[in-house]
UniProtKB/Swiss-Prot annotation:
This is Probable oligoribonuclease. InterPro entries: Exonuclease_RNaseT/DNA_pol3, Oligoribonuclease, RNaseH-like_sf, RNaseH_sf. The active site is at residue 159. It comes from Drosophila melanogaster (Fruit fly). One of its GO terms (biological process) is nucleobase-containing compound metabolic process. Residues 38-202 form the Exonuclease domain. 3'-to-5' exoribonuclease specific for small oligoribonucleotides. GO terms for molecular function: 3'-5' exonuclease activity; 3'-5'-RNA exonuclease activity; nucleic acid binding.
Length: 211
């Protein structure tokens, strides 16, 4: 098990290094004045192991720098063979079946490649290439799955991320009273709901921490 975890860690490190190097070469290709938008994405997966788990749902919203929604993008449930759903752990089984997501996936006619292409097309129409960061909660996890399963989408985004969970952790340490009135999560475990909650949460921190 330890050897396997080390191999996974090395694989992730290689992916991240090559990813940053690739995007760093094109930092100057962004269009001046249009790089302040944030691309919010959220994925629902069969688990958190990128070596074996799959993307079940993907959604995207674009905001300006002040967190005003400029465009609400696509939200796709992705169809998979039955064995993918059967391989989920107990937590995912409970929440994804209860939310109705698995039923949506089973009835969806969109596969992973099609979802990736449609998300990429949406980004191409709304933001310049490699200009806007990815936003979300614990969004580094989503980024790893995007890097592996949606590489063209990953390559279109800026290499930086805006992780709301980082701000929450800092507030907990430096301004704990701020968290008492922070927006509460509904825990629907659906992509669009999670994005909207992340935007609302960051707007709260913006108003109360970044005065």
């Amino acid at each position: 098990m330890l050897a396997h975890l080390r191999r996974v860690g090395l694989s992730l490190n290689r992916q991240i290094r090559s990813h940053i190097a690739f995007n760093s070469n094109d930092r100057m290709s962004s269009t001046c004045g249009l790089d302040t938008d944030i691309v919010w994405m959220d994925l629902e997966m069969t688990g958190l192991d990128i070596e074996k788990d799959k993307i079940l749902e993907v959604a995207c919203i674009i905001t300006d720098q002040d967190l005003n929604v400029k465009s609400e993008g696509p939200c796709f449930a992705i169809n998979h063979p039955q064995e993918v759903y059967d391989s989920m752990n107990e937590w995912c089984m409970k929440h994804h079946y209860n939310s109705g997501l698995i039923d949506r996936c089973k009835s969806s006619d969109v596969n992973l490649e099609e979802a990736s292409n449609l998300v990429l097309s949406y980004l191409e129409k709304n933001i310049p290439k490699r200009a806007c960061p990815l936003g979300g909660n614990s969004v580094y996890t989503d980024r790893l799955f995007i890097m592996k399963f949606m590489p063209l989408v990953d390559a279109y985004l800026h290499y930086r991320i805006v992780d709301v969970s980082t701000i929450k952790e800092l507030a907990k340490r430096w301004h704990p009273a701020i968290l008492d009135s922070a927006p509460k999560k509904s825990f629907t475990h659906r992509s669009l709901d999670d994005i909207r909650e992340s935007i609302k949460e960051l707007a709260y921190y913006k108003a109360n921490l970044f005065k």
